[in-house]
Design a protein with these regions (language model features):
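Membrane-integrated ABC transporters
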Residues: 1-49, 67-79, 97-101, 118, ...
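An intracellular "coupling" helix at the cytosolic face of ABC transporter transmembrane type-1 domains
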Residues: 26-33, 125-126, 142-151, 155, ...
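Transmembrane helix-loop-helix hairpins at lipid-water interfaces of multipass membrane proteins
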Residues: 35-93, 173-178, 288-295
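ABC transporter TMD-NBD coupling linker
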Residues: 305-369, 410-412, 417, 459-468, ...
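Conserved post-Walker A segment of ABC ATPase nucleotide-binding domains
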Residues: 351, 402-468, 532-533, 537-544
Length: 600
């Protein structure tokens, strides 16, 4: 187990309050000093707020004991005005701090969300296949919601709860040492009892989160395949499945609800008992000592006892909320754990001015039991700006090589050499320079423009340039709304080739800043004439980029500088088109695709 994984395990064992605070601190980033500043403002505001009960007690005692002259009346009026001053001071500091807290919470939420998305996008395809998208979405949404709620709304509550408890106890110690000790001891027992129950509830919250993750995964499946559900008349089946996934959490939810209500009943009764006992004690001792029971002193005791009791009780409620939030944050730890396994291989790039890259002894299998190698001891070399073609029959390994180069799958063996020098974590660094444009177009239910730009800022010149490169300009021109046309709008019907060209525009735009562009038959459904023009456009506009293309139609080969011939996961021949024309396996492949004249 790595040090990072051990830290993750330690976080799971920590008190929820500490863990949630550490999570906020981690994602505060450059705003940590600002966090300390507004927490100090909350401290001043909370301290000022505590003075209200004390001042009211003084007012009552003043009226009861010494209200016999104008000077004493003026003193009374001054103390009454103190209540207004306290409120003004409170809002001066509290209001400022709340604004800073809310704005900081926004940035904490942003940092957390970006962190999780970065990690998810860096994880290999195998992880994504093993972890349902709906489950992952639910974990991220719950985690970011928990972090946002705590950092925007809960930190000031925590500060005031601690101030109300310890500030009130300090004042009670000054009023009567015995009462202060009793209140501290009694309240501590209440808090321990409530937190013990919450520790048990934490287990139920984690279970309920898991049930929710699975439910979200099912809902995601059914809604993302709604056409299949409707056409196969699966509405009742789907409803039953959703209901069964809901009902499976009922027993846990029932236990959590009953225990939770018992906890609140216990806390409320215990706090009231503490207050009653202290007030009886104070009234009894004052009466027998002086014959006078001061209303103000009783009010001060009652006010601060109630504040302490309410604060402990509220702390129990607050702790329960934090246990829920912490459980949601912990739910996303599986993403962190998976990322830690690849962290060391993620960062870093090849030299900016690299000239030649060589792949040596690359091995790969989809079979975890290693019964079959899908790629075996593959060796490839390419220069910056070179145009490479990968040819071979279906299943020969062309697409697999491209997927590994882009980092979709980790190879089981192999090294990367850059300008003759071996590169540590070479495949992870190589993928940072690559854009892969796949064969199957993924079209979103949105406008043509959205499908191209993914709603990212894009210069109009770039947009038009790549539309022309992909031979998609005529398609856009025939649509009444042009780029603003929704692909699923009534009357809009894109053919398979047009959908491929739409996806190709998006891929070429994304490849603008990449050194290496991989084409995995992205024009397989495009007619031969447009396919030829597309490749000519790509090679003309991407002169300084390396283009490696898996192609099915071999009439394009005269456009490439170098060719690799694949068969059953191995490279069986390589060279220029002129050189490969002498190879009998290559001749056979050309004849098979009806290009007999090309090899004669």
């Amino acid at each position: 187990m790595s040090n990072k994984e051990e830290k993750t395990q330690e976080r799971r064992k920590k008190n929820p309050i500490i863990n949630v605070l550490k999570t906020e601190w981690e994602f505060l980033g450059s705003r940590r000093k600002l966090f300390l500043f507004y927490m100090f403002l909350f401290f001043i505001a909370g301290t000022a707020g505590l003075m209200t009960t004390l001042v009211i007690g003084w007012i009552f005692n003043s009226i009861q004991q010494t209200m016999t002259s104008d000077s004493e009346l003026r003193k009374l009026i001054f103390m009454i005005f103190l209540l207004l001053a306290i409120k003004i001071i409170f809002w001066m500091f509290h209001g400022t701090a709340r604004i800073l807290e809310s704005l900081t919470g926004f940035h904490v939420h942003k940092n957390y969300t970006n962190n999780k998305m970065y990690k998810i996008l860096e994880l290999p395809v195998k992880w994504h296949k093993d972890n349902h998208s709906g489950d992952t979405i639910d974990k991220v949404n719950r985690g970011r919601g928990a972090v946002e709620n705590f950092s925007s709304y809960y930190t000031f509550e925590l500060m005031y709860l601690l101030l109300n408890i310890f500030g009130s106890l300090i004042i009670l110690f000054f009023v009567d040492l015995k009462i202060g000790i009793f209140a501290l001891t009694f309240s501590s027992f209440i808090l321990v009892g409530v937190m013990t129950v919450d520790k048990k509830l934490r287990k139920y919250y984690l279970q309920l989160n898991k049930f929710s993750n699975k439910l979200s995964a099912s809902i995601f499946d059914y809604l993302s395949n709604i056409i299949t559900v409707i056409t196969l008349r699966l509405r009742k089946t789907v409803s039953k499945e959703i209901d069964s996934r809901l009902i499976v959490s009922y027993d846990t939810y029932k236990k959590e609800t009953i225990i939770n209500e018992f906890k609140w009943a216990f806390g409320s009764i215990a706090i009231t008992l503490m207050t009653v006992l202290v007030l009886i004690y104070q009234a009894y001792t004052n009466y027998h000592a002086t014959g006078i029971i001061l209303i103000g002193t009783l009010y001060i005791l009652y006010g601060y006892l109630r504040t302490v009791g309410d604060a402990f009780f509220e702390f129990g409620r607050f702790y329960g909320k934090l246990v829920k939030l912490n459980a949601r944050i912990e739910g996303a730890y599986s993403i962190d754990d998976a990322f830690e396994k690849v962290r060391g291989r993620v960062n870093g790039k090849l030299p900016y001015n690299w000239k030649e890259i060589e792949i040596k002894n690359m091995n790969f299998t989809y079979d975890e039991e290693w019964k079959r190698n899908h790629l075996e001891n593959l060796n490839m070399k390419f220069r910056r700006g070179q145009k490479i073609a990968l040819v071979g029959e279906s299943g020969s390994g062309k697409s697999t090589v491209l997927a590994i180069m882009r980092g979709l799958y980790p190879p089981q063996g192999g090294e990367i050499y850059c300008d003759g020098e071996k590169v540590r974590n070479g495949f992870m660094k190589l993928k940072q320079h690559i854009t892969l444009i796949p064969q199957d177009p993924e079209i979103f239910n949105n406008t043509i423009k959205y499908n191209i730009t993914m709603d990212l800022p894009t210069r109009k010149d770039d947009l038009n340039k790549f539309i022309e490169m992909a031979q998609f300009k005529k398609v856009v021109a025939r649509l009444e709304k042009g780029l603003d046309t929704n692909v699923l709008e009534k009357g809009v019907s894109l053919s398979g080739g047009e959908k491929q060209r739409l996806a190709l525009v998006r891929g070429l735009l994304a490849a603008k800043n990449s050194d290496i562009v991989l084409l995995d038959e992205p024009t397989s459904s495009v007619d031969s004439l447009n396919e030829m023009k597309i490749h000519e456009n790509i090679f003309r506009n991407f002169k300084n980029k390396t283009v490696i293309s898996s192609i099915h139609r071999l009439h394009l080969l005269n456009k490439f500088d170098y060719i690799y011939l694949f068969d059953r996961g191995k490279i069986i021949a390589e060279g220029t088109l002129a050189e490969l024309r002498k190879n009998y396996r290559f001749k056979y492949l050309m004849k098979k695709y009806g290009l007999r004249k090309e090899v004669e």
